[in-house]
Regions:
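N-terminal periplasmic "start-of-domain" segments of outer-membrane beta-barrel proteins
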Residues: 7-22
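Extracytoplasmic gating/loop element in the C-terminal half of outer-membrane beta-barrel translocons
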Residues: 60, 265-286
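Short glycine-rich beta-strand segments
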Residues: 140, 237-243, 280-284
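Amphipathic hydrophobic-ligand
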Residues: 157-159, 250-253
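Outer-envelope exported proteins of Gram-negative bacteria
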Residues: 177, 235-237, 272-278
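Primarily recognizes Gram-negative and organellar outer-membrane beta-barrels
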Residues: 219-223, 242-251, 258-268
Length: 286
């Protein structure tokens, strides 16, 4: 029995259960089921209770009680800047969209020197066995001519990508994906030296088409997806810009977050360590 999920569909919770109906009682699987539901980050609290069935003393009934938390957010702002004049930003983010467990977001930031529009969508259960699928599409423009310290240039990037995540243990996933990005640089009378050195000899029109393949791994043992108090999250990723585009490079990233309570009596006090390493290796400029 599942209760308390006024918005979230039952199937979003049931697919995280590891103690199945008509199977042998296993306390470890019940504990794992609770942690997996809590790790979704959709609920303020998750409780699982076992109740004896009166007519069948050798069987128990498991009840799942959840308390939903607000997940959607809408942001909007306006500001003034000496370099960018009026700055506008807006965004919509919704986890567990319409109770389906899917996530989507849209962001808009615009000013006289930069404009960004980005949309992303993730279905964590694209297949019944937990393969996830994500889409991203974005466009970014930047005009540095009004900031003298950056040099005189403009950039215009557009991209779209798709990613898949395949679980192979209760905590581990492997990821793979592909992204296409088109970037065009416009050089003014006083461009940055690194742009002039690279763009003019190798890219006469100062534009590139990048075809980026990626593969990665993650391990998530946190007790909660939004407000963890213990456990860790690791992710390693390799992005490779293939020779199909005008630029070839590899980028390696690694992220580690570790959570631990500072005291045994106060759950809200916790240690939080986040490390991120990133490097980009140029392979070819031909």
């Amino acid at each position: 029995n599942i209760s308390g999920n006024a918005k979230t569909r039952d199937e979003v919770i049931r697919r995280e259960l590891r103690q199945f109906e008509s199977s042998w009682y296993d306390a470890d699987k019940i504990r794992l089921s609770r942690n997996r539901i809590d790790r979704l980050g959709y609920f303020q609290s998750v409780e699982m209770e076992t109740n004896t069935i009166i007519d069948s003393l050798d069987q128990v009934d498991i009840s799942v009680q959840v308390e939903e938390r607000p997940l959607g957010s809408i942001t909007a702002g306006i500001g003034l800047s000496s370099s960018e004049d009026i700055v506008l930003n807006a965004g919509v983010s919704q986890q567990n969209f319409l109770g389906t467990g899917t996530d989507l977001s849209f962001q808009l930031n615009t000013s006289d020197i930069s404009q960004t529009y980005a949309f992303s969508y993730t279905d964590p259960y694209w297949t019944d066995d937990g393969v996830s699928r994500s889409f991203d599409i974005y466009t970014r423009k930047f005009d540095a001519s009004r900031i003298t310290s950056l040099g005189d240039y403009t950039s215009d990037s557009k991209g779209l990508g798709i990613r898949f995540g395949v679980p192979y243990t209760e905590f581990d996933k492997i990821f793979f994906g592909f992204k296409y990005e088109a970037t065009e640089l416009g050089l003014g009378s006083n461009p940055p030296g690194r742009f002039a050195t690279y763009c003019i000899p190798y890219l006469p029109d100062c534009s590139t088409d990048s075809f980026i393949a990626s593969v990665g791994w993650s391990r998530d043992s946190r007790d909660n997806g939004l407000a963890p108090t213990k456990g860790s999250y690791q992710r390693a990723n390799i992005d490779y810009a293939t020779p199909l585009g005008g630029v070839e490079y590899a980028r390696l990233t690694y992220k580690l977050q570790w959570f631990k309570p500072l005291t045994k009596k106060t759950d809200w006090k916790k240690a939080y360590i986040s490390l991120k390493a990133e490097d980009r290796i140029e392979i070819s400029q031909d």
